[in-house]
A protein has these predicted regions:
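Conserved aromatic-histidine-acidic binding/catalytic patches
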Residues: 4-8, 60, 84, 146, ...
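Short active-site oxyanion
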Residues: 1-3, 55-57, 80, 167-171
Length: 203
């Protein structure tokens, strides 16, 4: 059974990865997935579909970007999707800013110049991802209204897409008391942990 974690970055995707591995799932290579950003931007979803044949479960980019989940759903009948969320859009935004500040801004919210110079998949990759995904500009790369609007709209669209297929989508906040048990029921396995591991937290 194929599983796609399609929640936004900073919604517990690292913890989900650890949990899925514990339950025997082979996770897709995250860096190889991130390198498919340009294909996603150009609408070349077939390369993403082909990459999704290389493992049992996937998370992070490009799987939480735009309508990618729709192409995956069509190409992988019977696949399950996990939409992880935070307590609120503001909490998600603040967590993302803290994480990027640590990764790319030397402790402060990164500037467009810093993002353009950041070396990750390629120099400027993170700038290209942010501006393409959220529709922001060089003048205000982390425009709060645009990022939060994307977060809300994306989650709403995913929920609406699967509204008549409750067995195919798990909407989950990893902080929920019964979240891990719901996860286990969703994937059809007995619990192997007491709860979700809390990893990659940004303070």
């Amino acid at each position: 059974m194929k599983i796609f974690c399609i929640g936004q970055n900073k919604t517990g995707t690292t913890s989900l990865t650890k949990t899925l591995k514990k339950h025997g799932y082979k996770m897709g290579n995250q860096r190889k997935g991130e390198l498919l950003f340009r294909d996603w931007k150009d609408g070349k979803f077939q390369s993403i579909v082909e990459f999704a044949r290389t493992a049992d479960a996937f998370q992070d980019r490009p799987f939480y970007m735009g309508d990618t989940y729709k192409y995956l759903d069509v190409n992988f009948p019977g696949a399950k999707f996990i939409l992880s969320v935070r307590d609120s859009p503001d909490q998600w935004y603040d967590s993302l800013i803290r994480f990027h500040s640590r990764m790319f801004g030397a402790g402060n919210k990164p500037t467009a110049r810093q993002l353009k110079r950041a070396g990750y998949c390629y120099t400027g990759w993170i700038y290209d991802v942010i501006t393409s995904l959220y529709g922001t500009t060089e003048e205000d790369v982390y425009n709060k209204d645009k990022l939060i609007d994307y977060y809300i709209t994306y989650n709403t669209n995913v929920i609406d897409y699967f509204k008549d297929r409750p067995d195919d989508l798990l909407l989950i906040n990893l902080k929920e008391k019964d979240g891990y048990n719901r996860f286990c029921k969703f994937i059809g396995q007995a619990p192997k942990l007491e709860s979700f591991p809390h990893l990659n937290k940004t303070k």
